[in-house]
Regions:
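Domain-level signal for soluble alpha/beta catalytic cores
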Residues: 1-388
């Protein structure tokens, strides 16, 4: 994994808006209606080529495929894992959301209506049989598309592919215990993790479930949350066993809830658990105004030798473009505590975690945000290396 040895590097979290013509075909596919599989494959390849080129043009150093072929960062696994069904009448909603929905019902009534622009609703996945990985062709297509896109352009320093963590898929109706279920999912997802790393790309594990598990949903006690979080960490580490840590990025966040966020758990309560996951770099929310102040916690948290922080300095829930000077300030705050070489500037979360005709940050604004991130990193580089 590259690090900011000579200048501040830039990256982001992964998902980007899909072109509308691709979304049209994806919608037919997701609803079980007739579509042209060959044309869909071509469109995904073209979309990956375009977003990789545009990331490089915006000045990003560590890029990805934008998850162009995935219906969401999570439920794409329904095509890659055997043993699951989707419950059509049961929408997926993280338990921690309910408290804020109860506190701000009018806002969430409006907010939830935006999901009508997604190509398919997120339905809860239910385990009804033995879990097995059946996504080998799909992950190899992801790898091939990203490699072809990179071969077509100069510029990026490195590339990663995101994959979801073993938790969060929904209800277990098959295994005798939750521990057995989690172990089976982790072992299945390991195949995808290995394929990505063996391709030469960095693996990013998307893990909002770590924070979800640790968050008080009003129906669990702290001891139970800590126990479940430890089981989650152990399962993920088992899935990652043998993979060099410097090939792994871990992304955690506060989910797709673009609301008041008054129920967010402090990052100080997350970091000790997060750092137990065997990764070389850790991505988390910073631009989120509920968490901008939390950079100070790293004064009291030792960062192990060789580890990297990927603080999110671009918000994923607002169409404001962050000022480069503000971004530079954030980079320098983290660098002052963990060392300039251990910071890569990133974003809070993905900009289209679900395939949607109306992502909450407009695609044209996303490219402007990326350009601002690159400019902010250049300003921070002058401050940190040249004392300017």
């Amino acid at each position: 994994m590259q690090r900011s040895s000579e200048r501040v590097l830039t990256t982001h979290v992964g998902s980007l808006a899909r072109p509308h013509d691709l979304l049209e075909v994806m919608r037919e596919k997701e609803h079980g209606r007739p579509y042209d599989p060959a044309r869909f494959t071509e469109m995904v390849t073209e979309a990956v080529r375009d977003v990789v080129r545009r990331q490089a043009e915006a000045g990003l150093d560590v890029v990805t495929d934008g998850e162009q072929g995935k219906v969401s960062f999570l439920t794409y696994v329904k095509e890659r894992l055997a043993g699951f069904d989707q419950v059509e009448e049961e929408a997926f909603l993280p338990p921690s959301w309910q408290k804020e929905i109860d506190d701000f019902p009018e806002y969430y009534h409006s907010y939830m209506s935006r999901y009508s622009s997604t190509v398919a609703p997120m339905k809860k996945m239910v385990c009804t049989g033995p879990v097995a990985y059946v996504g080998r062709d799909a992950v190899q297509a992801d790898i091939a598309n990203l490699r072809a896109a990179l071969d077509a352009i100069p510029g990026p320093v490195e590339a990663f592919l995101p994959s979801t963590s073993p938790s969060g898929f929904g209800r277990n109706d098959y295994y005798s215990s939750e521990q057995d279920y989690l172990a089976a999912v982790a072992e299945a997802m390991r195949e995808e993790y290995l394929a990505i790393v063996e391709s030469g790309f960095l693996l990013q594990v998307d893990d909002p479930w770590l924070i979800e598990i640790l968050t008080d949903d009003g129906h669990s006690d702290p001891a139970d949350r800590r126990r479940r979080a430890q089981e989650h960490v152990e399962a993920l580490n088992h899935a990652l066993r043998g993979i060099p840590e410097d090939r792994i990025r871990l992304h955690t966040c506060y989910g797709l809830n673009h609301g008041p966020r008054l129920n967010d758990i402090p990052l100080a309560d997350v970091v000790p658990v997060m750092l137990r996951i065997n990764a070389g770099a850790y991505s988390f929310e910073v631009a989120n105004p509920r968490h901008q102040h939390e950079w100070r916690i790293w004064a009291d948290v030792p960062l192990a030798e060789g580890k990297i922080l990927l603080p999110g300095l671009l918000g994923h829930a607002t169409n404001y473009v962050e000022h480069p000077e503000l971004i530079a300030d954030g980079i320098c705050q983290y660098a002052s505590l963990v060392g300039r070489e251990n910071v890569i500037a990133s974003a809070d979360c993905g900009f289209s975690s679900r395939a949607s005709f109306a992502p909450e940050v407009h695609p044209t604004v996303v490219w402007a945000k990326f350009a601002a991130l690159a400019e902010g990193a250049a300003i921070a580089t002058k401050r940190l290396w040249e004392g300017a």
